[in-house]
Amino acid sequence: MGIQLKNINKSFNNVEIYKDFTLNLPGNEISCILGPSGCGKTSLLNMIGGIIHQDSGSIEGLEDKIISFIFQEPRLLPWKTVKANLEFVLKDVNLRKKDEIVERNLKIVGLQDFSRFYPGQLSGGMKQRVAIARAFCYPSNLILMDEPLKTLDPKLKWGLMKTFLNLWREDQRSVIFVTHDVDEALVLGEEIFVFSRPPVKVKKRYTNPLNEEEKDMTNMEFFRQKNKIMDHLD
């Protein structure tokens, strides 16, 4: 089941960010929210995640949702090892099953040899891979991603996108991914929603036509689809 936002209103300091805003997000897909910085993308995630509340309107489809987050910064516990950071979200799982889940996810993100390392011993990209693995260890059915690739260089970003897709294919869940980067949207998003500046409207809903081979920034079809989306961006 998807998520429906109906007639959402939200203001900050008397500035209307959302006014009678309605949006339907599909279930069990990667939905990408694409728009300029400051347009309210993070606020949307925070409303869905229950971190903040809308002034009025309703959000439906969350009744059965268990949510995990992937933030811009990894937010790992520095006094715990990589393995212990993942185990931390598996408190109610027996030891054998816990080890199995942690080992599987660390292997998919390519960090099986770093399980005893501490966050301070890892690079920024490695920390974010741990954060992604942790989100998939947690028994959630909805993952909210708030620009987790924003501060990374292009090579690291590309590797992390592939890492995320590998995990998602192994364990498909509903994902809402926020970004201002068209390349990220085309690589990760199945449905792409282009937001305007506030008060927010959906300028374009775009079903991603690219296959796996075409999800390459050097591919001509990728370049063509990127230009189509950019025509709708503020």
Language-model features: where?
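Catalytic Walker B motif of ABC-type/P-loop ATPase nucleotide-binding domains
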Residues: 143-147
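Helix-to-loop junction immediately C-terminal to a conserved catalytic motif
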Residues: 49
